Amino acid sequence: MMLVELLSGVISCVCALLAVAFFTLLERKGLGYFQLRKGPNKVGLMGLPQPLADAVKLFTEELVKPTLVNVFPFLVCPAMSLFLALVLWILYNNYFVCSMGGLSMLLFLCVSSLGVYSVMGAGWFSNSKYALLGSVRAVAQSISYEVSMSLILMSCLLLVGSMSLSMIMKYQFFVWVAFVNFFMMLMWFVSCVAETHRAPFDFAEGESELVSGFNTEYGGVGFALLFMAEYGNILFMSVLVISLFFGGVVFVGVFGMGLCVMVSFVGWLFIWVRASYPRYRYDLLMYLIWKSYLPSVLSILMFLVVSVYILNG
């Protein structure tokens, strides 16, 4: 049984990495068409092998270690970031979800909150002012929006009465939580965009102020691992949006095609938002969470608590 669980987890991680590779191609092609150009189309048929060519290029580059970095933690942080991103995908390993019982969402909260340490370490151990300031911005942004994400998640758990992801999905077989909690769903999506440091909330970097942010000193393998972790988190958040608000179990169907279509649409929304909206201001981003989202989420959560208490007698 343990071997089956282990193999199932490994397969989940490998599939996630393959999805990340082709999601980067989708983003580059999509942004190209948004900007009235073709995007990558020279490698193979319509540019489809482009992610494989990029992987070969990045992983065969020389490992450059800047003079002032703390070498060991500098090299460990990207690997730690990717490891944490892949651990989240174990939630969608059927055997592991069953063995976790009612604690799968608790695992999500714990692992997702650990991601800020790898980002902070990547900037801190680079011993670069640009990288350090970028990591401080990224950590402040992540911690702020984790507050709203946790409270929104609590509202979903309150409606279902369980911390099990499989129970949340089964609960929505007849009615989606998105219909009951539509504004929470919108706030969750915006929080996911901010949590993954995506445009228009990409304040961890900035060409005119922070260069590339916390990954300024990374090249080759380190750069690849950091961005694989970022895109892995984007895809995981897309799956989680469908599971929490649109009853992911309903779409499983034949070979899970319905679920794949819905997740692809949410992933495309991340790209669409990046292509459509200008960069936000950092102070307005913080005002959005602390002065708008937090009071709204707390009010809705209190309303749900009172409603559930009254309905349960």
Curated annotation (Swiss-Prot):
- Cite the InterPro entries for this sequence: NADH_UbQ_OxRdtase_su1/FPO (IPR001694), NADH_UbQ_OxRdtase_su1_CS (IPR018086)
Stated EC number for the protein is 7.1.1.2
| Gene Ontology biological-process entries | aerobic respiration
Keyword annotations from UniProtKB, A to Z: Electron transport, Membrane, Mitochondrion, Mitochondrion inner membrane, NAD, Respiratory chain, Translocase, Transmembrane, Transmembrane helix, Transport, Ubiquinone
The GO molecular function terms of this record are: NADH dehydrogenase (ubiquinone) activity
Keyword Membrane in annotation? yes
- Give the reactions, separated by semicolons, that this protein catalyses: a ubiquinone + NADH + 5 H(+)(in) = a ubiquinol + NAD(+) + 4 H(+)(out)
Whether NADP counts among this entry's keywords is no
Membrane topology value? Multi-pass membrane protein
Family, per the entry? Belongs to the complex I subunit 1 family.
Q: What does this protein do?
A: Core subunit of the mitochondrial membrane respiratory chain NADH dehydrogenase (Complex I) that is believed to belong to the minimal assembly required for catalysis. Complex I functions in the transfer of electrons from NADH to the respiratory chain. The immediate electron acceptor for the enzyme is believed to be ubiquinone.
Protein name (Swiss-Prot/TrEMBL): NADH-ubiquinone oxidoreductase chain 1
Q: Which organism is it from?
A: Heterololigo bleekeri (Spear squid)
Lineage, please? Eukaryota, Metazoa, Spiralia, Lophotrochozoa, Mollusca
Q: Which gene specifies this protein's sequence?
A: ND1
